[in-house]
């Protein structure tokens, strides 16, 4: 939980080694990188808004990690965190994002015309398609550190901007605190709304303070374009629909996102972005594009195949269970998406998903016929 600077000053009365957390049983990126020497060097620092090293690492201290999934173990509290604590963040970013160096520059491409194909993924296998990203509004602290007033100001700004969308993007805002328990649960079950703040990662980072104050969901009339407000990021922008037309989903995503950015600019606000890290978000795992393009895909045979994980790795894809991270695949249905966020453009990431999913379907069809898939094994992308 974010503490005041006064409390951080009090901690400095103790020697650095007395304050260093016990990370001996941890499996996360932060624990891998943070040394007592680095801690001693950074512990007295804070960003202009007062975010400290302890605030950055607390979620990773409290959540040692998952035996099979390497969690990140740290968060940013404001745009300046990535610079103030770069000795910690840079190696984590390099480790998490496939060797992305502090000198590398990120590229952005939100032109859906540059996507090749993607409008014909077989709906017998692809049940739904979805593209999401996050955006942070410059000048405000991020959710682990923002005050109630900041959070409410972000909500007000976002709702004003979104209410100007028209055509097939026109919709309305639903504040969490004005929903009934049943309405919330229905939206969560239908994969439209973020979960209640039960995740220890969310709780330990301070993101769930004052819940549900100033949180909510905005969506268009047919629920194909959604914006979550003040969950893990200021904004999460989502385009989704049933079936396999990823091109249509991505086109709506790009158009909506571009319009939202223009609306914010007209109110003299911009999104946090820099040439090195791309779009700045709360979790280092989402830096760059913040983009996750995914499909719910039926792979009952390939999902049981010993080479499934290797195939995904070579295609730079990752799988989750039907209900998201840490859930089981029900009825052979997996959530398959791009593994990368940083160092590739939005179009490149969606292209990897489109091309990869076509190959996964081809492999599934082979296995249905009882045939081998060895000759279809892809090279490492």
Curated annotation (Swiss-Prot):
<feature type="binding site">
    <location>
        <begin position="128"/>
        <end position="132"/>
    </location>
    <ligand>
        <name>ATP</name>
    </ligand>
</feature>
<feature type="modified residue" description="Phosphoserine">
    <location>
        <position position="309"/>
    </location>
</feature>
<dbReference type="Pfam" id="PF02807">
    <property type="entry name" value="ATP-gua_PtransN"/>
</dbReference>
<dbReference type="InterPro" id="IPR022414">
    <property type="entry name" value="ATP-guanido_PTrfase_cat"/>
</dbReference>
<feature type="binding site">
    <location>
        <position position="132"/>
    </location>
    <ligand>
        <name>ATP</name>
    </ligand>
</feature>
<feature type="binding site">
    <location>
        <position position="292"/>
    </location>
    <ligand>
        <name>ATP</name>
    </ligand>
</feature>
<keyword id="KW-0832">Ubl conjugation</keyword>
<keyword id="KW-0472">Membrane</keyword>
<feature type="binding site">
    <location>
        <position position="236"/>
    </location>
    <ligand>
        <name>ATP</name>
    </ligand>
</feature>
<dbReference type="GO" id="GO:0005829">
    <property type="term" value="C:cytosol"/>
</dbReference>
<feature type="domain" description="Phosphagen kinase C-terminal">
    <location>
        <begin position="125"/>
        <end position="367"/>
    </location>
</feature>
<feature type="binding site">
    <location>
        <position position="320"/>
    </location>
    <ligand>
        <name>ATP</name>
    </ligand>
</feature>
<keyword id="KW-0547">Nucleotide-binding</keyword>
<dbReference type="InterPro" id="IPR014746">
    <property type="entry name" value="Gln_synth/guanido_kin_cat_dom"/>
</dbReference>
<keyword id="KW-0496">Mitochondrion</keyword>
<dbReference type="InterPro" id="IPR022415">
    <property type="entry name" value="ATP-guanido_PTrfase_AS"/>
</dbReference>
<feature type="binding site">
    <location>
        <position position="232"/>
    </location>
    <ligand>
        <name>creatine</name>
    </ligand>
</feature>
<feature type="cross-link" description="Glycyl lysine isopeptide (Lys-Gly) (interchain with G-Cter in ubiquitin)">
    <location>
        <position position="107"/>
    </location>
</feature>
<keyword id="KW-1017">Isopeptide bond</keyword>
<feature type="cross-link" description="Glycyl lysine isopeptide (Lys-Gly) (interchain with G-Cter in ubiquitin)">
    <location>
        <position position="45"/>
    </location>
</feature>
<protein>
    <recommendedName>
        <fullName>Creatine kinase B-type</fullName>
        <ecNumber>2.7.3.2</ecNumber>
    </recommendedName>
</protein>
<dbReference type="InterPro" id="IPR036802">
    <property type="entry name" value="ATP-guanido_PTrfase_N_sf"/>
</dbReference>
<dbReference type="GO" id="GO:0005615">
    <property type="term" value="C:extracellular space"/>
</dbReference>
<dbReference type="Pfam" id="PF00217">
    <property type="entry name" value="ATP-gua_Ptrans"/>
</dbReference>
<dbReference type="InterPro" id="IPR022413">
    <property type="entry name" value="ATP-guanido_PTrfase_N"/>
</dbReference>
<feature type="binding site">
    <location>
        <position position="285"/>
    </location>
    <ligand>
        <name>creatine</name>
    </ligand>
</feature>
<dbReference type="GO" id="GO:0005886">
    <property type="term" value="C:plasma membrane"/>
</dbReference>
<dbReference type="GO" id="GO:0007420">
    <property type="term" value="P:brain development"/>
</dbReference>
<feature type="region of interest" description="Disordered">
    <location>
        <begin position="96"/>
        <end position="123"/>
    </location>
</feature>
<feature type="binding site">
    <location>
        <position position="72"/>
    </location>
    <ligand>
        <name>creatine</name>
    </ligand>
</feature>
<dbReference type="GO" id="GO:0046314">
    <property type="term" value="P:phosphocreatine biosynthetic process"/>
</dbReference>
<dbReference type="GO" id="GO:0004111">
    <property type="term" value="F:creatine kinase activity"/>
</dbReference>
<feature type="binding site">
    <location>
        <position position="335"/>
    </location>
    <ligand>
        <name>ATP</name>
    </ligand>
</feature>
<dbReference type="GO" id="GO:0030644">
    <property type="term" value="P:intracellular chloride ion homeostasis"/>
</dbReference>
<keyword id="KW-0597">Phosphoprotein</keyword>
<feature type="cross-link" description="Glycyl lysine isopeptide (Lys-Gly) (interchain with G-Cter in ubiquitin)">
    <location>
        <position position="101"/>
    </location>
</feature>
<dbReference type="InterPro" id="IPR000749">
    <property type="entry name" value="ATP-guanido_PTrfase"/>
</dbReference>
<keyword id="KW-0418">Kinase</keyword>
<feature type="modified residue" description="Phosphoserine">
    <location>
        <position position="199"/>
    </location>
</feature>
<feature type="modified residue" description="Phosphotyrosine">
    <location>
        <position position="125"/>
    </location>
</feature>
<comment type="similarity">
    <text>Belongs to the ATP:guanido phosphotransferase family.</text>
</comment>
<feature type="modified residue" description="Phosphothreonine">
    <location>
        <position position="322"/>
    </location>
</feature>
